[in-house]
Curated annotation (Swiss-Prot):
Keyword Iron-sulfur tagged: no
Keyword Ribosomal protein carried by entry: yes
Cellular component GO terms, alphabetical: cytosolic large ribosomal subunit
Lineage summary: Bacteria, Pseudomonadati, Pseudomonadota, Alphaproteobacteria, Rickettsiales
Protein name: Large ribosomal subunit protein bL35
Transmembrane portions of the chain: none
SUPFAM superfamilies for this protein: L35p-like
Keywords, sorted A to Z: Ribonucleoprotein, Ribosomal protein
Originating species: Rickettsia akari (strain Hartford)
Amino acid sequence: MPKLKTKSAVKKRFKLTATGKVIASQAGKKHFMRRRTKAQIRNLRGTTILCPKDGYNIKKYFLPYGIN
């Protein structure tokens, strides 16, 4: 049986930690930044850990070798 392919869109947007959690960048930072306060913009920097259910769905359906 051939190897399963990873969805390349998911590969670009999410990463797995060593403990198996899924990391994604914060949403809401592409446009309409003028209406946001400086504190909101600052809090949108960096990455966030997805909730366990969303992380499970990402690993199960889009990262075929993400679930051990």
